[in-house]
Amino acid sequence: MCRCPPEHHDGRMTSAEVGAAAGGAQAAGPPEWPPGSPQALRQPGRARVAMAALVWLLAGASMSSLNKWIFTVHGFGRPLLLSALHMLVAALACHRGARRPMPGGTRCRVLLLSLTFGTSMACGNVGLRAVPLDLAQLVTTTTPLFTLALSALLLGRRHHPLQLAAMGPLCLGAACSLAGEFRTPPTGCGFLLAATCLRGLKSVQQSALLQEERLDAVTLLYATSLPSFCLLAGAALVLEAGVAPPPTAGDSRLWACILLSCLLSVLYNLASFSLLALTSALTVHVLGNLTVVGNLILSRLLFGSRLSALSYVGIALTLSGMFLYHNCEFVASWAARRGLWRRDQPSKGL
C-alpha cells in the first residue's frame, strides 16, 4: 500500500491496493481520515476495485486479440467502421440504465470527451490493423507518462517527486520487455502514438467527469457513445468507401467475431470507467503496464517462449518502477534517514 501523504496522490486508490485486494482480504487498519469527512466517504471498497480491475484487464486483452484476428484472419479492412459499431452497441446497451438530465456545462465536457474518445479508438484500430499486436502494446506502454503530464497540466494534480521519477523505469522497462522480442521492423506506429496521447487525455477527462461531476459509468458511456458513433460513422463513410469489399451477410463467423468484439468493448469501457471513478487515470495505466510484463512471464511459463536479455532487463526495470511508484514515501523516509533526501526540499531529492 502506498505510504504517500494524501496531497501527493492523483486519485483515491493506487493499483498496489488493487493488487492487495485481488490477492486476498487483509485486516483493516485505522482510517486515514476522520469519519464522515469527504475523503473518508470517497474510499472505495477493495473488492469493487479488484473486480473492476480484473474485468478491465481480461476484457481489454481479449478485445485487442480479437480485433487483430478480425483484421488479419478475416481480412476486415474497415477499422473505423468497427470502432463505430463498438460505439453503437455501447449506446444500445446503456440506453435504459443511463440518467438523462445533465447540466449544460457537463454536456460540453462530455462532447469534448466524445471527440477524444472516438479519435483515440479510430487511431488505435487503424494502427492495430497495420502493426503486430506486441508492437501495439509496446507503444501503449508510454501512456502513463502522457497521463501524468496531462493530469498535472489540465487538472493541477500534484505528484510526489519519486512518483515522477518512477515513470522512467516503468515506461522504459515495459518498452524494453517487448522490444527485446521484435524480429521485424516497426511500421505504422504514427497512428498508435496518436492513440496513446489521446488515450492519456481521454483518461484525464473521464476521471474529472466521474469524480468531480459524480457521473456513473453507464451514464458517461451512454453520453459519449452517441457523439462518438456519429463521428466514427461519418469518418468511415468518407475514408473507407471502396477501401475493401464489404463483408457478405453469409459470413457468419466474421459477424460473430464483430459482435463479440462490440460486447467486449462495452464491458471494457464500463470496467474502465468504474476503475477510473474508484482510483485515478494514472493508476489505471500503471496497472496496464504491469500486464505487459505479466503476459511475457506467462508466455514463458505456459508456452516455453524464450525471452531475450533485453526483455529480462525490461521486466526488472518495470518492477522497480512499480515499487517506487507505490512506495514513494517509504523510499523517501529511508533516504532521509541516510541524509539522501530532504523532506523540506523534495525537488532536490533522489
Curated annotation (Swiss-Prot):
Coiled coil: none annotated. It comes from the Eukaryota. The chain crosses the membrane at residues 51-71, 73-93, 110-132, 135-155, 218-238, 258-278, 279-299, 312-332. Residues 19-30 have a biased composition (Low complexity). GO terms for molecular function: antiporter activity. It holds the Pfam family TPT. GO terms for cellular component: Golgi apparatus; membrane. Residues 125-179 form the EamA domain. One of its GO terms (biological process) is transmembrane transport. Keywords: Membrane, Transmembrane, Transmembrane helix. This is Solute carrier family 35 member E4. The lineage of its organism: Eukaryota, Metazoa, Chordata, Craniata, Vertebrata.
